[in-house]
């Protein structure tokens, strides 16, 4: 009736950590993000820290926090724990992730201790990656969370009032928590799970540096956008200009006009949609804004999703 479930050695799939596993993990960073409840975006592979190289430098799009990922194809060891802390300090990381085949109990305890002793802005995660097969099936991978922050304990240890969130910040956090929960549970739009006390939230497009965003601007407007924010100005303007060449096609598909914001005085560019809305609106008005944000984000993704990747690939080679 049932097949036999078998674990596969990681080295059968990825013989070499640096040349096989790290590139695969970088390419599948979104899957790791799902296991952690984050939208992770790759920043750099083999990022230099003095004479050493971090496996993966990334960003949590929901909070813009820096993320470091150190991985190994074997059980955790003291050498990699030392590297993990060195890289965390070198990049001033807020989110520290250790991926391995197995996590020794003393190393899990070390991660728990670090989570208990650090502030609410710093989080340490231990993640086990496993590969499984059923009989002679194709191998499948799975990420299992082995160590993570105890948010209740971190909240308890938070210093007040210096560490407290403003009333408006709490409103933003509650709004975006509701928004991302809806987008995740009902539309599979994001893996994010934690709202932030800020007036914006970004979501992965699948191309590093290009994101979908939901925002509240200072002019009493709510905005849904495609944000083109690579580190290179020329590449951003190229992507924007190429999209603008098919403006009529894009706007016809969306069913409305877009605000085309090249932002010539800045590095980034964006395509935006606006409606009236403020975080200080009534609960019923904010529900309407949330419904608008969801509708427009889904439309932007369905209209622009297939167009972004080819332009991103060309821009990368420029």
Where are these regions (language model features)?
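Charged, terminal alpha-helix-loop-beta segments
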Residues: 1-318
């Amino acid at each position: 009736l049932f097949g036999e479930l078998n674990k596969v050695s990681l080295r059968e799939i990825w013989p070499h950590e640096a040349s096989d596993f790290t590139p695969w993990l970088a390419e599948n960073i979104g899957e790791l993000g799902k296991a952690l409840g984050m939208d992770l975006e790759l920043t750099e592979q083999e990022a230099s820290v003095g004479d050493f190289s971090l496996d993966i430098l990334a960003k949590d799009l929901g909070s813009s926090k820096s993320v470091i990922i150190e991985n190994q194809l074997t059980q955790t060891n003291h050498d990699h724990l030392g590297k993990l802390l060195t890289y965390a300090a070198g990049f001033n990381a807020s989110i520290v992730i250790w991926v391995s085949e197995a996590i020794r109990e003393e190393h899990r305890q070390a991660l728990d201790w670090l989570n208990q002793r650090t502030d609410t802005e710093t989080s340490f995660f231990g993640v086990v990656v496993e590969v499984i097969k059923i009989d002679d099936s194709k191998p499948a991978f799975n990420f299992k969370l082995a160590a993570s922050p105890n948010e209740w304990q971190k909240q308890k240890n938070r210093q007040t009032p210096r560490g407290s969130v403003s009333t408006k910040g709490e409103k933003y956090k509650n709004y975006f928590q509701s928004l991302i929960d809806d987008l995740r549970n009902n539309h599979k739009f994001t893996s994010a799970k934690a709202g932030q006390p800020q007036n914006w939230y970004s979501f992965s497009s699948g191309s590093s540096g290009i994101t979908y965003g939901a925002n509240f601007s200072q002019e009493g407007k709510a905005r849904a956008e495609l944000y083109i924010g690579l580190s290179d100005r020329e590449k951003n303007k190229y992507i924007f200009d190429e999209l603008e060449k098919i403006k009529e096609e894009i706007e016809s598909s969306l069913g409305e006009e877009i605000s085309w914001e090249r932002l010539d005085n800045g590095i980034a560019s964006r395509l935006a949609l606006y409606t009236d809305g403020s975080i200080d609106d009534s609960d019923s008005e904010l529900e309407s804004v949330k419904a608008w944000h969801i509708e427009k984000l889904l439309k932007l993704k369905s209209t622009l999703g297939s167009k972004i990747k080819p332009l991103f690939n060309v821009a990368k080679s420029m």
